[in-house]
Amino acid sequence: MRRLLAWSFLVIGAGLGATPAGRYIVYPTVTAGADLRFPRDHGAHPEHRTEWWYFTGWLEDEQGKPLGFQITFFRSRPATDPDNPNAFAPNQILFAYSVLSDPSTGKLIHEQRVARAGFGLAGAATADANVKLLDWQLERGTDGVFRARVPAGSFSLDLTFKPTQKAMVNGDQGYSRKGPKPEQASYYYSMPQLAVRGTVVKDGRSVRVKGRGWLDREWSSTLLDPKAVGWDWAGINLADGGALMLFQVRGRGGDALYAGGTLRRVDGSKVVFGPNDVRFVPRRRWRSPATGALYPVEAEFVVKLPEGERRFTLIPLFDAQELDGRAAGMPAYWEGAVSTNGGRGYLELTGYAGDLKL
């Protein structure tokens, strides 16, 4: 879903600051042969059209009650005139989303922020992860621990994310195809098995929490094929210490335009999945009373491994994890906490409340 939100608010910003005779920027193309380096690639890549820092995971409070969470910071570069002298021209736009899934209420609560970079209000550093957006902040300390602080009206999160493993580089050394054309790709790595600690403030109560998280980092300029109408993605922290990322990009009629993923085993060895190695199989659907969308909230990702086929059945923490952003000019989608045989993680389902317009 982070892809859809990134492109949605990018389109909103694209018309700002351009002039009729203006010269539009040319974005760099994502190509094979990536050489990802850290901590540099934890930081922003402002020359590319869009990127995100996407945290998800499962938390438990002091009574052992589960919560799901998502914190995502986006950076986008609108296609505006680079010679525009107007200080208010949006050369970079920052957007962030925070979501809490609470099975005790069976509801999602969410908050968001958006601002153009500059004026001391918003910005994303390039040397390391350090993103500021109004009163929200994401930063990586010298000890390698990420911290996200997202105070909001209905709830607040203050969480630290301590890496327990090295980054999982997806695709071909970080070059991750998302479509049939080679330029339909991103630079992409994940940081699974993050040790999460912090506080959740909800209904006026501050609760200590801990759990396991996942960070997805992607940046790109041309991501999806024009025939794409949606996608299904999962990031799973496996109970044995391994990690699994799988995705399918759908065309009209539900056919798979492209698919892929990564399995990192507990010994550190990796299996990189190609388009013919991954299938997404819906098992049970839930209809949203708000949008009427029919989501495959219980499904299987079927993968081909060297030792044979394996099925990962995804079960939602609860069904009603749809986020309806239509009132704010955003799409409706489903993104929620799920469990599987031998793991926990997050599933995103897009394009079920209407075809994506990218």
What do the predicted segments below correspond to?
Residues A6-G15:
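Bacterial N-terminal signal peptides
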Residues T19-L358:
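Structured soluble/peripheral alpha/beta segments that form catalytic or ligand/cofactor-binding pockets
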Residues M1-L4:
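Positively charged n-region of N-terminal signal peptides that target proteins for export
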